[in-house]
Regions:
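Conserved glycine(s) of the Walker
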Residues: 225-228
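Walker A/P-loop NTP-binding motif
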Residues: 230-243
């Protein structure tokens, strides 16, 4: 269902704050990436110029150090590219989760994570454990599994957004997960419970396949265009995130 005008204005303010933080982070990270590339080039040059004085054991250590430095640079570059990807559409959904200790968590779900200067999570990567609540549950009692164990609580709200060119153009609350933009626009006004339940079942089953950690081999059957390839690609992304 649609949300009130006050709620809509509140969401616009949140989007504005996220956009500013995202812009600031990109500026700082861009400088870091550029400097890292220069430093790494100098590091390789130094290693190469001194390589003749290394024995076999020292050379292995040099190679390992070089690979380690290269991986640090690549990780930062990959994160920078991800932030560039979400610059105009920083997030697509949010949940309000009340844990069994009474603490309220406002989780904004994105393609990657974003932290503020105090290292607080502002955006959560969709692959993180707590974000599975958005895909697996309707509003009500819920739980998710994280490295520290299983956490219980109540899903108070599920909200989805349509953001275009940094502007909020659509928001609706729904107990379900709707992945289709046309359906989002319809549901922002009204639709039958039957339609909502059908879409929810599909999305929930897809998420179960994507996040399955118990079975090493999975067989997914479906007609052409049913989303098998999409599920496979998202499963690969999820498994890589878990490494």
């Amino acid at each position: 269902m649609g949300i009130s005008k006050d709620e809509y204005l509140k969401e616009e303010k949140i989007l504005s704050k996220v956009q500013k933080l995202l812009g600031d982070t990109l500026n700082e990270l861009g400088k870091d990436v550029y400097q890292d590339e220069e430093d790494f080039t100098e590091f390789k040059k130094m290693m190469w110029e001194n390589s003749s004085s290394f024995d076999a054991g020292e050379m292995r250590q040099v190679m390992a150090a070089t690979e380690q430095e290269a991986e640090k640079v690549l990780q930062k570059q990959r994160y920078f590219k991800k932030l560039c990807q979400i610059k105009t559409k920083p997030y697509f959904a949010s949940i309000v989760f009340k844990d069994d200790h009474g603490k309220i968590w406002n989780i904004y779900i994105s393609l990657t994570y974003l932290k503020d200067d105090d290292f607080n999570n502002i955006l959560y990567d969709w692959r993180s454990p707590i974000c599975s609540l958005f895909y697996d549950y309707e509003v009500g009692p819920c739980s998710y599994v994280a490295p520290g164990g299983e956490y219980f609580g109540e899903l108070k709200r599920k909200r989805q957004y349509k953001i275009e060119n940094c502007k909020l153009v659509g928001v609706f609350d729904n107990s379900l997960n709707i992945d289709d933009e046309v359906l989002q626009e319809v549901l922002a006004h009204e639709s039958s419970d039957k339609m909502k339940n059908v879409v929810n079942t599909i999305q929930q089953e897809q998420n179960q396949v994507i996040r399955n950690l118990e079975d090493h081999n999975l067989i997914v059957q479906g007609i052409a265009g049913s989303g098998k390839t999409t599920v496979a690609l998202h499963r690969i992304a999820f498994l890589l995130y878990r490494l």
